[in-house]
C-alpha cells in the first residue's frame, strides 16, 4: 500500500469510528466558550472554525460565545485609557464600555463570523443587545474585612450579570441552520450596556437552551489536583469537595463555578477544555480521548 493510500485508509478509519459519537450528538446543542490561546494562534483559529463547521455539517448545533479581554486591553492601551481590575473583573466606566462594545461587538465578533463563513459555515454575529438576547443588571460587588462592621459595596461600573436569555432568537437561528456567535455584552432595563464575563454568559446560554454540553476553552490542560495531575472526570459532588479543601482556588474558581452551575441547571455536562490542542473540540466529542476535565452528574467512563 502506498503512503498516500495508507493515509486515506487511516482517514476513512477515523471517520468510521466517529459514527457512534456523531449519532449521539445529532440534533443536540453544544455551547462553546471561545477564548484564550485558541483565539490568538492563526493555526488554532482556523482549526476552530473548521471544527465548528464540521459539527454543523453532521447535524450538531454549535452555539459560540467568545471573549476578548486581551484585545480590549490592547485598544485601551493604544487610547491611553488605564485598565483597572477588582477581583479579576475589569472596572468598566462609560468610556471603557464604549471600547468594550467596539472590540467585542465590532472587531472580535466579526472576525470569528468571517472565519467560520470562509470555511463553509453560516455564522451570524450577535451581541446581547440584539433582540435583547442577553438581559442583564448591574453586578454588585461587596468586600468585607474583619475590621468592618458592614460590607463595603464596590462600584465597578458597567459590569453586569445575566438575568435572562432570549432563547426564541437562538432557537430560530439554530433551526435555520445558522451558527450563532455571541459577544458577551448585556442590555439593561433602560437600554444600558453591560460588560459580562464570557464564561458566565456561555453557562447561562447553555442552561437556557438545555444544551447537551458546555465547553469552556482555556489555556490549561484541565483542572489539576494538588500533585499537578489532570482530573479528567468529576461529579458535581467531587467539585464541591475540591473547592472546600482548597484544591480549586484563585482564578479557576469562577470558571469552575460556572461549569458546575450549568450542570446543576440542566446542562448534560460541562468541560474545561485545553484550547491549545489542535482540534480539541473534535477530540472531545468524536473520540474517547479527553483533553480536559469533564464535570457531570456521573464520572467520565
Curated annotation (Swiss-Prot):
InterPro entries linked: AceGlu_kinase-like_sf, AcgluKinase_fam, ArgB, Asp/Glu/Uridylate_kinase, Glu/AcGlu_kinase, NAGK-C
UniProt site positions, description: Transition state stabilizer: 33, 255
Annotated SUPFAM superfamilies: Carbamate kinase-like
Keyword ATP-binding: yes
Biological or metabolic pathway of the protein: Amino-acid biosynthesis; L-arginine biosynthesis; N(2)-acetyl-L-ornithine from L-glutamate: step 2/4
MF terms (GO), sorted A to Z: acetylglutamate kinase activity; ATP binding
Enzyme class name: transferase
Binding site for substrate: 68-69, 90, 195
EC number(s) from the headed UniProt entry: 2.7.2.8
Reactions catalysed: N-acetyl-L-glutamate + ATP = N-acetyl-L-glutamyl 5-phosphate + ADP
Main location class: cytoplasm
Family statement drawn from the similarity comment of this UniProt entry: Belongs to the acetylglutamate kinase family. ArgB subfamily.
UniProt-listed HAMAP family: ArgB
Name of this protein: Acetylglutamate kinase
Originating organism: Pseudomonas fluorescens (strain SBW25)
Lineage: Bacteria, Pseudomonadati, Pseudomonadota, Gammaproteobacteria, Pseudomonadales
Amino acid at each position: 500500500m502506498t503512503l498516500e493510500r495508507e493515509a486515506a485508509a487511516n482517514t476513512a478509519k477515523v471517520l468510521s469510528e466517529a459514527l457512534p459519537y456523531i449519532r449521539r450528538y445529532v440534533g443536540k446543542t453544544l455551547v462553546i466558550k471561545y477564548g484564550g490561546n485558541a483565539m490568538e494562534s492563526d493555526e488554532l483559529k482556523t482549526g476552530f472554525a473548521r471544527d465548528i463547521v464540521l459539527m454543523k455539517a453532521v447535524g450538531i448545533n454549535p452555539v459560540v460565545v467568545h471573549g476578548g479581554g486581551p484585545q480590549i486591553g490592547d485598544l485601551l492601551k493604544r487610547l491611553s485609557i488605564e485598565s483597572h481590575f477588582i477581583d479579576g473583573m475589569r472596572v468598566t466606566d462609560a468610556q471603557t464600555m464604549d471600547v468594550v462594545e467596539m472590540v467585542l461587538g465590532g472587531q472580535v465578533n466579526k472576525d470569528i463570523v468571517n472565519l467560520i463563513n470562509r470555511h463553509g459555515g453560516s455564522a451570524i454575529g450577535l451581541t446581547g443587545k440584539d433582540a435583547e438576547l442577553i438581559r442583564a443588571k448591574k453586578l454588585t460587588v461587596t468586600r468585607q474585612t474583619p475590621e468592618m462592621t458592614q460590607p463595603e459595596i464596590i462600584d465597578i461600573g458597567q459590569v453586569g450579570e445575566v438575568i435572562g436569555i432570549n432563547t426564541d432568537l437562538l432557537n430560530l437561528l439554530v433551526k435555520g441552520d445558522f451558527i450563532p456567535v455571541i459577544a458577551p455584552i448585556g442590555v439593561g432595563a433602560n437600554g444600558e450596556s453591560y460588560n459580562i464575563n464570557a464564561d458566565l454568559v456561555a453557562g447561562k446560554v447553555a442552561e437556557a437552551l438545555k444544551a447537551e454540553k458546555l465547553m469552556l476553552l482555556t489555556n490549561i490542560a484541565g483542572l489539576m489536583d494538588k500533585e499537578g495531575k489532570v482530573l479528567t472526570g468529576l461529579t458535581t459532588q467531587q467539585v464541591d469537595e475540591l473547592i472546600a479543601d482548597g484544591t480549586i482556588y484563585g482564578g479557576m474558581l469562577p470558571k469552575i463555578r460556572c461549569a458546575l452551575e450549568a450542570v446543576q441547571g440542566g446542562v448534560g455536562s460541562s468541560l474545561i477544555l485545553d484550547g491549545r490542542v489542535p482540534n480539541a473540540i473534535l477530540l472531545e466529542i468524536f473520540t474517547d480521548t479527553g483533553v480536559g476535565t469533564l464535570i457531570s452528574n456521573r464520572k467520565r467512563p
